[in-house]
Design a protein with these regions (language model features):
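Mature extracellular/passenger domains of Gram-negative fimbrial/pilin and adhesin proteins
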Residues: 1-322
Length: 322
């Protein structure tokens, strides 16, 4: 009996989502059969089996639970690099009634498994016309190619006692990564001009100048138009001698070629909350096309005395999509 099911729609996953992230899941999926039935009967004296095997390799390594399910050792590698499939069967191939097989993994029915029946099926024998997928999930197993990736392949080959090759299931679907590009002119002003200030503008440690707005543009953003699945995370690291003064405050030193002293530079979000340094910070959900990271920067007095001169700072930024 040949069964075929296509997962509807494009399934999106953030480019830098960790291995083990769920891309898609569904429960209680019924698939119509080819128009004839698989018939089995048992008076309890026979041990009938339904060996639900798979031609797909098992993805190596351990995975975190998905929807509370232990999937390690049962994630099947699809033809899309980095995309695995976890599949539980139900219905006649894995149930609790006397006229069903019961999976030998405690009734979970995670492919591959062997279903067993040694019970009296009377008064109703097993008559299987349709296939039930109790639960399925697409799971990230590694790097996924950019662009649209498709799969359509046989995922289950079932051998049933006295019948032989009895059940085959083909699944198909499409997966695309959510991501953007960072162009050379991504920063609205580079360098960001923080202005010229008098020594009198600094009234003591912790005093600041007025913040200057700037932004970083993420271009060519691709994400689910029905609702973003990815968020942009940004990491800021000092270069050219700029190092953190207070990571949590987003405060860093001037560059080594600066001649001013006693001040640093602070990076803020548009709402004036600090952007932490040297760690990835959740900034914003992706918008298809253009996504903008709105930021501000200002001078921040770090010492009791401020020495006038040129005051420069330098940071590198790195973006991940999770």
């Amino acid at each position: 009996m040949q069964f075929t099911h296509n997962i509807s729609g494009m399934r999106w996953v953030a480019r830098d989502a960790p291995v083990g992230s769920k891309i898609y899941s569904a429960t209680s999926t019924g698939i119509a059969g080819p128009g004839f039935a698989l018939n089995c009967d048992n008076d309890g004296s026979l041990a009938l089996t339904a060996n639900m095997g798979t031609p797909l390799p098992v993805a190596p390594g351990t995975f975190p639970p998905v929807d509370g399910k232990d999937v390690t050792g049962k994630v099947l590698q699809t033809s899309i690099p980095g995309v695995g499939l976890y599949l539980e069967l139900g219905g006649f191939l894995n149930g609790t009634a006397s006229n069903t097989f019961q999976a030998n993994d405690g009734g979970i029915g995670a492919v591959p498994y062997v279903g067993e029946n040694q019970r009296n099926m009377a008064p109703t024998p097993l008559v299987m016309r349709n296939l039930i997928i109790k639960y399925m999930a697409l799971i990230k197993t590694g790097p996924i190619p950019a662009g649209i990736s498709s799969f359509s392949q046989e995922v289950v080959r079932g051998v049933v006692s006295d019948v032989g090759d009895a059940v085959r299931l083909t699944l198909g679907g499409q997966v695309q990564q959510a991501q953007c590009t960072v162009k050379a002119d991504a920063v609205s002003a580079n360098p960001v001009q923080l202005g010229t200030h008098d020594i009198a503008d600094f009234t003591g440690q912790g005093s600041t100048t007025n913040p200057v707005d700037f932004f970083i543009t993420l271009s060519d953003c691709e994400d689910d138009p029905a609702g973003s699945v990815a968020r942009a995370f940004m990491r800021l690291d000092g270069v050219d001698g700029s190092v953190p003064v207070d990571r949590d405050l987003g405060l860093f030193t001037l560059t080594t070629d600066s001649t001013a002293a006693g001040i640093g530079i602070q990076v803020l979000r548009s709402d004036n909350t600090p952007v932490k340094l040297e760690e990835y910070v959740d900034m914003v959900g992706l918008t298809p096309g253009i996504t903008r990271l709105d930021l501000r920067a200002r001078y921040y007095q770090t010492a009791a005395t401020v020495t006038p001169g040129e005051a420069k700072g330098a940071l590198n930024f790195t973006i991940e999509y999770r």
